[in-house]
Amino acid sequence: MSERSYYDILGVSKSANDEEIKSAYRKLAIKYHPDKNKGNKESEEKFKEATEAYEILRDPKKRQAYDQFGKAGVGAGAGGFGQGAYTDFSDIFGDFGDIFGDFFGGGRGGFGGGRRSGSQRGSDLRYNLEVSLEDAALGREYKIEIPRLESCGDCNGSGAAKGSSPTTCPDCGGSGQIRRTQGFFSVATTCPTCRGKGTTISNPCKTCGGQGLQEKRRTINIKIPPGVETGSRLKVSGEGEAGPNGGSHGDLYVVTHIKRHELFERQGNDLILVRKITLAQAILGAEIEVPTIDGKKAKMKIPEGTESGQVFRLKGHGMPYLGAYGKGDQHVVVKIEIPKKITRRQRELIEAFARESGENIPGSKGKIFTK
């Protein structure tokens, strides 16, 4: 069964406007919200599915990327596909105050609203890496540079100046949330005093401004395994952003995008190559050499009477299977090259060949021959 599109999940058409998308999501969110369907795993999954779809389709850039590349080209906060683009995979439920505020009276819903105090895991990052077809076939190590949030060295991530420390928020008691009940809904809203941290800082660190985090650039070596294709996602554990309050780093996801090749066309794990041959080679047969993706040459026999467009297979000369043994094949499409100019002697021989074949070729007045 094919994977449902984000439009199908929300029940809207591809031409739906922002209000239609928001309205469709609002209905699904109310219907499947976990606080309304406690213990119902199916409802929880449908809520997550609808939220993921809305997170992509509400953002014009993400929606455009999704329409063009599908799910392979988008992630939470995706910002395009140029070399080195990276994305923050923050908790997608954190951005929907405008939706839940309409029917919960403001703030976040109870789903995903756990305790906020203490250290938290950092956000994941996405990095789009352009890879040549040769590197995708052979594998290669790339050196990339990413901007990311790291723990402040002066305050060790606490956000408080030296000699001081954060104190428990008096309004939420350190939970980071204010919870209230409306009918069968139990709604947890972010504490406005500590903004969900559970602590307050009276004397903030001057280096990081009390955030506990600083943006820095980090260079990382990435090993691209043989066989990757456009949309392949490589996980680099612990290379995402540092978490608040000294929390652990998230992960880095490197998404590969294979560049177009001037000779080869990739179809799955097979490669297609167009190779020109002469008229004589097509008629008489020959043994020719063809380039392969590993930079070498492979010998291939052209049988007598080969026609233009005929396809020959070089077994095992295609792309490697990612994470497995074996390779695809290379398919060579031959094209007979007709000379634009011929010598007088060549013309005489071709005319003699035509007469021998019973063809009546009148003398041409054109100048397609050279001396």
From Swiss-Prot:
Zn finger residue spans: CR-type: 139-217
Molecular function terms, GO-annotated: ATP binding; heat shock protein binding; unfolded protein binding; zinc ion binding
InterPro entries associated with the record: DnaJ, DnaJ_C, DnaJ_domain, DnaJ_domain_CS, HSP40/DnaJ_pept-bd, HSP_DnaJ_Cys-rich_dom, HSP_DnaJ_Cys-rich_dom_sf, J_dom_sf
Binding site for Zn(2+) 1: 152, 155, 205, 208
CXXCXGXG motif repeat ranges, renumbered to this chain: 152-159, 169-176, 191-198, 205-212
Chief subcellular location: cytoplasm
GO cellular component, one term: cytoplasm
Protein localization: Cytoplasm
Positions contributing to Zn(2+) 2 binding: 169, 172, 191, 194
Cofactor stoichiometry and binding remark: Binds 2 Zn(2+) ions per monomer.
SUPFAM superfamilies xref list: Chaperone J-domain, DnaJ/Hsp40 cysteine-rich domain, HSP40/DnaJ peptide-binding domain
Gene3D superfamilies, per database record: DnaJ domain, Heat shock protein DnaJ, cysteine-rich domain, Urease metallochaperone UreE, N-terminal domain
tRNA processing among keywords: no
Keywords per UniProt: Chaperone, Cytoplasm, DNA replication, Metal-binding, Repeat, Stress response, Zinc, Zinc-finger
PANTHER family: CHAPERONE PROTEIN DNAJ (PTHR43096:SF48), DNAJ HOMOLOG 1, MITOCHONDRIAL-RELATED (PTHR43096)
Oligomer status and interactors: Homodimer.
Domain-related comment: The J domain is necessary and sufficient to stimulate DnaK ATPase activity. Zinc center 1 plays an important role in the autonomous, DnaK-independent chaperone activity of DnaJ. Zinc center 2 is essential for interaction with DnaK and for DnaJ activity.
This protein's name: Chaperone protein DnaJ
Organism: Leptospira borgpetersenii serovar Hardjo-bovis (strain JB197)
Origin organism lineage: Bacteria, Pseudomonadati, Spirochaetota, Spirochaetia, Leptospirales
